[in-house]
Amino acid sequence: MLVAGTGNAGAFGEIVMSIAAVNARPLGLPKAQPAVPPVARPALQIRSSHDDKRKILFVTSELTDLVKTGGLADVSAALPRALGARHDVRVLIPGYSQVINSGHPIRIVGSLSGYAELPGCRIGRIDMPDGLIIYVLISPELYERDGSPYVDGHGNDWQDNPVRFARLGLAAAEIAAGTACISWAPELVHAHDWPAGLAPAYMHWRGLSTPSVFTIHNLAYQGNIDMSQRRLLGIPGEACDPERMEFYGKLSLLKAGIAYANHVTTVSSTYAREITTPEFGCGMEGFLSMKARQGLLSGLLNGIDESWEPESDPYLVSGFSARDWAGKQANAAYVRDAFGLEKRDAPLFAVVSRLVYQKGVDLTLDVAHAIVEGGGQLAILGQGERQIEAQVRQLAEQYPGQVGAHIGFNETDARRLFAGSDFLLMPSRYEPCGLSQMYAQRYASLPIARRTGGLADSIEDGITGFLFDAPDAASYRQAVQRALAVHHHPELLGAMRCRAMAAGFFWRHAIEPYDALYQQLLGERREVRLLI
């Protein structure tokens, strides 16, 4: 909707020790050891005084309030709000059809001229009910079309994606330069993932002193384009170098963000370490290792929003707490009914995930027999690759009453699965951060996960969940057997649930290292100005 206008427990300690003892040699199996050496969480060295709010612009391709394809949208919506008590944080997003037709009034507040083959566009402003300000990049020819932000209805990349997201990056640079006529300019720009990767680059090419942060949410998505498109996007020749944007004969929008930002972050400490190795580096491990040696790469764990509260969540059949598990049992009963599972008191395992290879769903199919043989039940919710979807359906047919599956996704069933299950399965081959394991712990469902990325950083093995190392069915099966062993000891299961629910995953805690980083970069900018 466009609107014309202008805009300026004592016993608990003993129980935890017992948990460790049970998990040390479960069913005769040795306890797993870390595949990646543990990485210390970032130490907070600078705390915001809150006295002087700084102006910060987030640049992102999706935002949960308006358009979402994955976890980037959740972070893009939650992190600015969490930081909003300390700073003036605003968000820039393309004006997709979903945004324009969201029902939120959009006031036109600025305009931008064309550059190279990037068209001119207008800037709209949405004022969300909670006070978050969103700038919308309005260009119908680039953004107002059916499909997702990145692909058409057939799942094919939009052919003009380089132009669409270069326009986003350039708009951020022009807003930072104060040339967008919106009566507001940021003191720091925070760009997210490859669609916003050119924002720090255009800022550099235009000689701006405004510091920038670039966050890698998933290194596997790189925004690689043909070298021939350089002139269309107004990319200078100097950028076509291995130390800048060049990547195996192409140009990478993700690498542009890494190369030109003042600081690079990713979404967990372990993932920050992993992406400097050949196994997880996706061809950029050398470049990222250099950034790490220079002290310019940090891993900052994501958080979750305040809506994940089991006592008051309106999506649940019944709320519950660590003092009263009746509500959890009510949600388990719903899950069994909705997924066609036998109504019996059995260990209930859940999958809430995209059904894709990265998430290790094929490994879950391999260990499902061990779950059923161990007396457990399995409920699967998700969608993704058609072959894996078909295999999930076949599994449910193979084990009627013990395995149930819904292909698709809805928030109500997802939250009730977290609340009703005993264990959440996350055998990801890699997981930059992951949020589901945090949701599960808040709702007393113990995650069983591979020790990788944010899973390693947010799950305490044998205390709040179960970790395994190798991405294979044998290691995964051992972790499942450990969980089944704990389920036979109700006092241990209860203690682990209580510990998991107490984990401090909310964004109000997670913003501290972001605030410290912003203050550091803004302080460095001030020092440079004083020297000049």
What are these regions (language model features)?
Residues 4-6:
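Short linear segments in intrinsically disordered or otherwise low-structure-confidence regions
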Residues 2, 12-532:
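Catalytic cores of nucleotide-sugar-dependent glycosyltransferases that transfer UDP/GDP/TDP-activated
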